[in-house]
Amino acid sequence: MLGKGVVGGGGGTKGPKPSFVSYVRPEEIHTNEKEVTEKEVTLHLLPGEQLLCEASTVLKYVQEDSCQHGVYGRLVCTDFKIAFLGDDESALDNDETQFKNKVIGENDITLHCVDQIYGVFDEKKKTLFGQLKKYPGKLIIHCKDFRVFQFCLGYTKEEEVKRIVSGIIHHTQAPKLLKRLFLFSYATAAQNNTVTDPKNHTVMFDTLKDWCWELERTKGNMKYKAVSVNEGYKVCERLPAYFVVPTPLPEENVQRFQGHGIPIWCWSCHNGSALLKMSALPKEQDDGILQIQKSFLDGIYKTIHRSPYEIVKTEDVSSNFLSLQEIQTAYSKFKQLFLTDNSTEFWDTDIKWFSLLESSSWLDIIRRCLKKAIEITECMEAQNMNVLLLEENASDLCCLISSLVQLMMDPHCRTRIGFQSLIQKEWVMGGHCFLDRCNHLRQNDKEEVPVFLLFLDCVWQLVHQHPPAFEFTETYLTVLSDSLYIPIFSTFFFNSPHQKDANMGREGQDAQSKPLNLLTVWDWSVQFEPKAQTLLKNPLYVEKPKLDKGQRKGMRFKHQRQLSLPLTQSKSSPKRGFFREETDHLIKNLLGKRISKLINSSDELQDNFREFYDSWHSKSTDYHGLLLPHIEGPEIKVWAQRYLRWIPEAQILGGGQVATMSKLLEMMEEVQSLQEKIDERHHSQQVPQAEAPCLLRNSARLSSLFPFALLQRHSSKPVLPTSGWKALGDEDDLAKREDEFVDLGDV
């Protein structure tokens, strides 16, 4: 499997020494160097990509059974990627189509995808950083997409070892300037031959027209308006040039505190309720300024809270929910479960897998995010309340929660175009700091927090539990997570729309120079061929049938709320237990004196949530209506395709969901074939039908983690450690003792 091998040392686990060391002498390698070089794969460079350093006579370890095997070749480092060029080691040198990325090869690592670099010195594994006095004999690279690469440098010339190791460390770990990113080199070199997919209708939300269209789509244009007060970013560099605010709000209010303290519209529900977000005002000590802020917020609150017609519930996600530090700490522990260097290390951790998983708290954080989104959905759907999300800059957890709420409530967001437009609206235009949160510049490790990856994991839970409700697949989500680290797309490499426009040459540009044309990640034709793109689309998804005008007229008298939910009695505004006026709740939150736990009755909120949650799950699911996930402990699962795809021992050959999907596609093809014959008889012509990917037609040749892990050329024979079973202390259990020595090679 790609990137797997056994390292002698590291983590206290010693694997067997390489079998080929006893049979291949360094002299023989150098003698045959010319012959081997002829077989090497050619280095393909993207426009603007430059070779920085390289080393020959490098062995890349490939795990095969319980032994070690190596592939001979060159290790190179460019200003875009680290690449290994050796003999063709494809597991399937055949006619079968593979799910290949046109930008990144299976032995390529973009510089931004490198997580940690280790060196092995005398059987000891050490983290590499800065200037080295001594260079390792083995190089181990852990990637952010969970690949693990191991290279033996024992036969490489000393000068080449120094050059390649120092180059890789410097270009992956040293702080960078934004303008030094490969993104700009590529855009400059490929400016004339950049192509875009004409079928990509993703709404980018970079024009006033896009926001007006979204208001009209959600029927929010009766109460909200799109404004251009920040055009040219003259009010606030953090906000997009265009956004939506409540209609009664004067535009001069937006300018008063540079966009802080302003309710910005996210989405409107069919019953008239809306989801809003707001960034907190700067904390002040001066009583005079505090009074001005209080008066300002009082006017803002009266704009959005008009009892009894419109009631606003505030959710402070920065103080009463999750902290960014919690997310980062949990993910750091969680990812270590999947970055194993060899089979022995994998099986050693297998016996304590669940305890390690639980101690990371990552799945619990996912559950808490989904629960919070359901709570907000209940307020909007069942109680017809507006919800205002509060956060310091409204660009992290606000993005996450508002996106999840829209996924649950709006079926349009569950289409591929709708989902991409949602990310553009809430994350890209919402000012999520991708550059800092992904630490692309390596300038501040403390700012690195995988908020967007947490969002994708939450979305995967929904996709996994309700597959027919989504037009896209888990494979789509996986390649989207990988695209975070490919610096030819501008989508995930800026902190704000202003930063992007300023560095593209759109602000203060020369008359002769024209702005750079940066690619968007939503143009999937850049990464995948059309046949591979079929794996991004869910064949089980069925679009909602469109009603004709006659049917629409007949349904106008019906209430717009989902009929599958129980009708609840109208409820008064939330209890006020500390302040006389609800407006003080908002003011206290935004002025930094947050005590919202004392305001709302937790018992009432819990009862409302449980009633709403249980009632929805007791009914049959309308995949084109409201969609709620199960959030009980066992229902929140590990996203196996993303986290386990490079671990051979974690795969089920010919099994898993891919086997089920294969059978379903066979049935669909049969139905389509019959439909074609019927259409031929009626219309005397053949109607073209979508064809299932050929790779799915024989599930016995596929892995459960398809399409990233196909049937391996060599069988895998895991050696189960006896130390783990002895730790159980039950030596009389014959079954357990026998299982230690079961040979799985012939199964």
Curated annotation (Swiss-Prot):
PROSITE patterns with a match to the protein in the record: PPASE_MYOTUBULARIN
GO process annotations (BP): phosphatidylinositol dephosphorylation
Record's compositionally biased regions (Gly residues): 1-14
Region (Disordered): 1-21
Cellular component, GO annotation: membrane; sarcomere; sarcoplasmic reticulum
Myotubularin phosphatase domain: residues covered: 205-643
UniProt entry keywords in alphabetical sequence: Cytoplasm, Phosphoprotein, Sarcoplasmic reticulum
Pfam families: 3-PAP, Myotub-related
Tree of life domain: Eukaryota
Assembly: Heterodimer with lipid phosphatase MTM1. Heterodimer with lipid phosphatase MTMR2.
Function recorded in the entry: Acts as an adapter for the myotubularin-related phosphatases. Regulates phosphatase MTM1 protein stability and possibly its intracellular location. By stabilizing MTM1 protein levels, required for skeletal muscle maintenance but not for myogenesis.
Family indicated by similarity: Belongs to the protein-tyrosine phosphatase family. Non-receptor class myotubularin subfamily.
UniProt name for this protein: Myotubularin-related protein 12
Organism per entry: Pongo abelii
Encoding gene, per UniProt annotation: MTMR12
